[in-house]
Amino acid sequence: MSKLLVLLMTTALATLAQAISFDCSDKPPECQNDPGCCFDIGITTF
């Protein structure tokens, strides 16, 4: 049961990271070079 929970959390984190990366690639180049900018926008969109 605990292994299943870990797998679920890992999948959720990977999905979230992918969503943030996707949002970042959508932004202007000067924003893409700034992880803080990308991360901020990703969280806001999410």
From Swiss-Prot:
Residues 1-19 form the signal peptide. The keyword Protein biosynthesis does not apply. The keyword S-adenosyl-L-methionine does not apply. One of its GO terms (cellular component) is extracellular region. Its main location: secreted. Expressed by the venom secretory cell of the spine. The spine is a cuticular structure containing a single large nucleated venom-secreting cell at its base. It is an independent unit capable of producing, storing and injecting venom. On the back of D.vulnerans caterpillars, spines are grouped together by 50 to 100 to form scoli, of which there are eight in D.vulnerans. Transmembrane segments: none annotated. Probable toxin. Does not show insecticidal, antimicrobial and antiparasitic activities. Does not induce increase in intracellular calcium in mouse DRG neurons, suggesting that it does not induce pain. This is U-limacoditoxin(6)-Dv61.
